[in-house]
């Protein structure tokens, strides 16, 4: 086999190799879920992704015999490190064939890069924030994949452990059936909260009604997500950009909020699982893939809970039960 050459992504061709490598690695895996490539191009664009404003990053791609065989991204999130008194670099969006030599070549280059930039340790997979897919999937490979979670082959776990890495934190996805009848305890909690009239429960019928709530939801997210590993709070500019980007694709009927004395104290955001539509168009939204995704949004029987939180001083009062039952 030829020599492994690791190079930094500097040109548009390099970036194309980087972005589309995973579909080559997973081409024989029928259950693999591609990303939405339109989003991928924006994710790695320093002009469009504002995270580059507070983070240093490097993209590397490994070639063997002039063919791309592996990729990795390194990130130093200065904002996170400052807030949490950390001194770590991150690796993320790593893909390669089942080849220990390629894996080692990539991870060792990121380790070197992190050390050269004053970092004392490396953690990952962890992107710019917790809102990027993070971690390696280590079990549950028999279940369908979905777009917001880790999407890796089982061998990646062995490859990273062989490099001396150990678990930092468990990240858990839950899959559950929606019961036709909720447990009696849920009904009692919901009845009690409703009778007290202490909280104002708000549902939405349209995006015009939802729009004024988006920024308050993101402000509450900053507060309630502070204890989540890897979370980076959004600044005012990012809140506006986040709202502008996601409001068009949110379905108001799957968003629930709770207020106390006019102040937002809880929120839950769900959206239909679009995985089948994304697979059908192979992650290519334009020009016609959007129709597969829109069609799936209407017929999907799975709901993904994307975000949710309750203000700390109101936890344990059944507000999460109220929103869960209603959604």
Where are the language model's segments positioned?
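Generic start-of-chain signal for non-secretory N-termini
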Residues: 1-31
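A conserved beta-strand-loop-helix scaffold within acyl/acetyltransferase catalytic domains
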Residues: 22-59, 63-64, 72-82, 204, ...
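Acyltransferase donor/substrate-recognition loop-hinge adjacent to the catalytic core
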Residues: 2-4, 150-229
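A structural signal for short, well-ordered beta-strand segments and their strand-loop junctions
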Residues: 120-127, 168-175, 257
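Acyl-donor binding region in acyl/amide transferases
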Residues: 82-164, 281-327
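Short, solvent-exposed loop/turn segments at secondary-structure junctions
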Residues: 128-130, 179-181, 207, 273-275
